[in-house]
Swiss-Prot record:
Glycosylation sites recorded in the entry for this protein: 106
Stated name of the protein: Xyloglucan endotransglucosylase/hydrolase protein 24
Coiled-coil regions listed: none
Family stated for the protein in its record: Belongs to the glycosyl hydrolase 16 family. XTH group 2 subfamily.
Disulfide bond sites: 251-265
Protein location: Secreted, Cell wall; Secreted, Extracellular space, Apoplast
Source taxon at top rank: Eukaryota
One of the GO biological process terms: plant-type cell wall loosening
Catalytic activity: breaks a beta-(1->4) bond in the backbone of a xyloglucan and transfers the xyloglucanyl segment on to O-4 of the non-reducing terminal glucose residue of an acceptor, which can be a xyloglucan or an oligosaccharide of xyloglucan
Protein EC: 2.4.1.207
Residues in the signal sequence: 1-21
Biological role stated in the UniProt entry: Catalyzes xyloglucan endohydrolysis (XEH) and/or endotransglycosylation (XET). Cleaves and religates xyloglucan polymers, an essential constituent of the primary cell wall, and thereby participates in cell wall construction of growing tissues. May be required during development to modify the walls of cells under mechanical stress.
Length: 269
């Protein structure tokens, strides 16, 4: 059997569930938290809570080699300083691959920081951070990870905020060989999450709660996402977000990379 056929068969095997939507009972397990993670409304809603003793988290029952995963999330309201709410993909092992949405809480009235990163073979250091153009605690909003062999696209309410392309031809690592599981969690990170750890979690406000709904997992290789690219409209929206709401970009951190930006940052396409 040719390498391509083996690869395609593996993709089909890992993507056995194909497309699933909006049923946490079917698609995920509450992995930790001693009852702080709860599946409600016949599998249509999942809540995670955090108190001084523990946070909580859940994970998909299946691993996926490429896919498009949508999740609606309503973040912790009020004074969420010190808390981190997450939605991400991650493979197993010490040289893991990972694609991150991490929502760093803040004091009442201050915006959340959306922290994104991409790891390949255990190496990350590709952080981009954003503020959002809405209050993510007032209503549910859709956060999506599109991961295909050519690119990773992160979107918020169908607006792209980040694209990470496959530049293996330039020697840049890209996650494409290891199936990943979907994870989500709510946990305390007041040693670093808010203003570098200067603002601590106010436990008098506990328990903190984040809500998830309308999970949709499409891992079917013949779907549109498998070859999806950014059209001109999407590129314009991406530039709008990055111009107005990006607050950190590793590509422009000259102190961190005094010898020059990483290779993927210097490409024009």
């Amino acid at each position: 059997m040719s390498p391509f056929k083996i690869f395609f068969f593996t993709t089909l095997l890992v993507a056995a569930f194909s497309v699933s939507a909006a049923d946490f009972n079917t698609d995920v397990n509450v992995a930790w938290g001693n009852g702080r993670g709860k599946i409600l409304n016949n599998g249509q809603l999942l809540t995670l809570s955090l108190d001084k003793s523990s946070g909580s988290g859940f994970q998909s029952k299946t691993e996926y080699l490429f896919g498009k995963i949508d999740m609606q999330i309503k973040l912790v309201p009020g004074n969420s300083a010190g808390t981190v709410t997450t939605f991400y993909l991650k493979s197993e092992g010490s040289t893991w691959d990972e694609i991150d949405f991490e929502f760093l809480g803040n004091m009442s009235g201050d915006p959340y920081t959306l922290h994104t990163n991409v790891y390949t073979q255990g190496k990350g250091d590709k952080e981009q951070q954003f503020h959002l153009w809405f209050d993510p605690t007032a209503n549910f909003h859709t956060y999506s990870i599109l991961w295909n062999p050519q690119r990773i696209i992160l979107t918020v309410d169908d607006t792209p905020i980040r694209e990470f392309k496959n530049y293996e031809s330039l020697g840049v690592l890209f996650p494409k060989n290891k199936p990943m599981r979907m994870y989500a969690s709510l946990w305390n990170a007041d040693d670093w999450a808010t203003r570098g750890g200067l603002v601590k979690t106010d436990w008098s406000k506990a328990p903190f709660m984040a809500s998830y709904r309308n999970i949709k997992i499409d891992s079917k290789p013949n779907s549109n996402w498998y070859t999806q690219e950014m059209d001109s409209t999407s590129q314009a929206r991406l530039k709008w977000v990055q111009k107005n709401y990006m607050i950190y970009n590793y590509c422009t951190d000259h102190r961190r990379f005094p010898q020059g930006a990483p290779k993927e940052c210097t490409t024009s396409s």
